[in-house]
């Protein structure tokens, strides 16, 4: 599994993460900023709203669990203490039902078999639960019987099939169909409703997502008069939380399906003061700038590799009053902050947030003010 800090007390984990951020700011960014205590969870267990569990044969029996470290050998798993209970229970029941009907797990070596992964998604605020069966082909022996038993034995909102016929380590294929119930489940963050499909990007720790986004909302200090640009906006989760308090929010994201989800979520919440566009942030934002769209507040929530150099150049040319940076990698955060501070911005503090207790992952939020 991925719980490589589980041997530390939870207070020890939070301090470890704070030290990591502080040390990285000094070493890579040459920045002397305040790094307060990591914002952790009251209960750091059972927080994950999504599980993706590979299925295989172990000792001639169908099983589902984790990959052994540095291999694709499956270790049988009866429970995972960071998965929410509903999803955990659903994985076990699904595994039992698949075994009962003699479903053949996918074999990476031969390319044969029917079932590749069991995935669950749970909506923290509504209690809605989705099961996704990732199969090698659309036809699967006893599919109707398996679906019927899942519905009888679990409290479900949705059962979805994803078809992935390719010899690949990528979990999902291109085709998805709903076998029972709704196409989506619905959750809320800061009172904003989100429709989540099998393949939607959505933060996996709903409790700490609210903590993380509150840091970003507080840092933005919106009055209702500001134009906000959200680079790397995903399905619009930060954008829509900010749209309640901004004049207009523009979001950009490279994944077209995420932009379609963002637009649908804006409509779901009747937030007409939003514009979402598919494309690279480093290409779309300069085009907006040329068209006269200038941000008062610019929000970035980039992938682990950090912000593209061209985007940082555009920020320095556009000169928004504030840059709110939400980071999942202290190293690239420190690097990008160094570029922005060399270009006239000032940062006083970097706030670590523990989104993934028991793991080494660290999220952090900072605000850079134009000097």
What role is predicted for each listed range?
Residues 104-112, 228:
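Short helix/loop segment immediately N-terminal to the Walker
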Residues 65-68, 132-134, 262:
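Short, acidic/hydrophobic/Gly-rich beta-strand patch recurrent on exposed beta strands
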Residues 142-153, 157-371:
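Rossmann-like S-adenosyl-L-methionine
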Residues 37-44, 108-109, 116-121, 352-355:
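Short, solvent-exposed loop/turn elements at beta->coil junctions and helix N-caps
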Residues 56, 120, 127-136, 193-197, ...:
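Short, aliphatic-rich beta-strand segments
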Residues 46-52, 61-63, 115-119, 128-130, ...:
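Broad gene-expression machinery/nucleic-acid interaction feature
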Residues 1-105, 125, 140:
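Extended interfacial segments that mediate partner engagement and assembly in macromolecular machines
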Residues 55-57, 122-124, 354, 370:
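Short, low-complexity Ser/Thr-rich regulatory SLiMs
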């Amino acid at each position: 599994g991925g719980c490589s800090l589980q041997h530390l007390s939870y207070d020890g984990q939070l301090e470890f993460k704070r030290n990591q951020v502080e040390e990285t700011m000094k070493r890579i960014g040459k920045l002397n900023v305040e790094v307060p205590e990591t914002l952790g969870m009251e209960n750091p267990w059972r927080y994950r709203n999504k599980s993706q569990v590979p299925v295989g044969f172990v000792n001639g029996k169908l099983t589902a669990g984790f990959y052994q470290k540095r291999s694709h050998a499956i270790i049988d798993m009866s429970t995972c203490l960071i998965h929410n209970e509903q999803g955990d229970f659903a994985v076990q029941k699904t595994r039992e039902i698949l075994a009962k009907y003699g479903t053949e797990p996918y074999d990476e070596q031969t390319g044969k078999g029917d079932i590749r992964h069991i995935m669950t998604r749970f909506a923290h605020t509504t209690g809605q639960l989705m099961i996704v069966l990732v199969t090698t082909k659309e036809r699967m022996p006893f599919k109707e019987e398996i679906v019927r038993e899942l519905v009888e034995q679990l409290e479900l909102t949705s059962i979805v099939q994803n078809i992935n016929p390719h010899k690949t380590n990528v979990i999902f294929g291109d085709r998805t169909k709903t076998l029972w119930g709704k196409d989506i489940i619905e959750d809320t963050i800061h009172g904003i409703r989100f429709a989540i499909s099998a393949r939607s990007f959505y933060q996996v720790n709903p409790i700490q997502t609210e903590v993380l986004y509150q840091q970003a909302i507080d840092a933005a200090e919106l009055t209702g008069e500001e134009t906000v640009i959200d680079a790397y906006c995903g399905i619009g989760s930060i954008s829509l939380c900010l749209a309640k308090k901004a004049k207009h929010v523009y979001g950009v994201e490279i994944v077209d399906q995420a932009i379609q989800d963002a637009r649908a979520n804006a409509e779901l919440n009747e937030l007409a003061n939003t514009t979402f566009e598919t494309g690279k942030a480093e290409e779309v934002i300069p085009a907006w700038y040329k068209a006269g769209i200038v941000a008062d507040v610019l929000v970035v929530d980039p992938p682990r590799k950090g912000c593209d150099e061209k985007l940082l150049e555009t920020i320095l040319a556009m000169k928004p009053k504030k840059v709110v940076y939400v980071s999942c990698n202290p190293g690239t955060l420190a690097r990008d902050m160094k570029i922005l501070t060399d270009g006239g911005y000032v940062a006083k503090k970097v706030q670590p947030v523990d989104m993934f207790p028991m793991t080494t992952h660290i999220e952090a939020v900072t605000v850079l003010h134009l000097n």
